[in-house]
């Protein structure tokens, strides 16, 4: 997922992010804690229209990684991270699945989301899909 963000704060306030560790490091740390994928549960979610399509194992793991990072307060305090202020009027581009990030402050933002096919990416081996597939030892989609 490639996202383009623009801070349009009319009062000139920055939008402040914390950007964390490389995705492979995050995946290796949290993957052992995640619940296993259940195809029947994915089918039930789709049948009940909780999800728009059948959730893949990759989607399942990415959602859990996100939740695990947010709920682990020790990780949030101790993980390597950088504060990134984006001034009002600035635009930035981010592979949001690959970049551990959290918004710390700011409001009034525009966002455009682009979905890139994994096989069309410049370095397919660096994608979150490839990294999680390597770490689990299996295909996830």
Question: Where in the sequence are the language-model features?
Answer:
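Double-stranded beta-helix
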Residues: 13-91
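Short, acidic Gly/Pro/Ser/Thr-rich loop/turn segments
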Residues: 9-14, 101
């Amino acid at each position: 997922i490639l996202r383009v963000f623009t801070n349009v704060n009319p009062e000139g306030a920055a939008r402040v992010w914390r950007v964390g560790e490389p995705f492979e490091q995050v995946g290796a740390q949290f993957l052992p804690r995640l619940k296993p994928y259940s195809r029947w549960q994915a089918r039930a979610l789709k049948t009940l229209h909780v999800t728009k399509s059948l959730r893949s194992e990759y989607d399942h793991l990415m959602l859990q990684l996100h939740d695990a990072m947010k709920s682990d307060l020790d990780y949030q305090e101790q993980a390597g991270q950088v504060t990134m202020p984006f001034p009002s009027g600035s635009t930035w581009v981010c592979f949001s699945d690959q970049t551990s990030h959290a918004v710390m402050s700011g409001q009034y933002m525009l966002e455009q989301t682009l979905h890139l096919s994994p096989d069309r990416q410049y370095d397919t081996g660096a994608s979150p899909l490839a990294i999680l597939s390597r770490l689990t030892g299996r295909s996830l989609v």
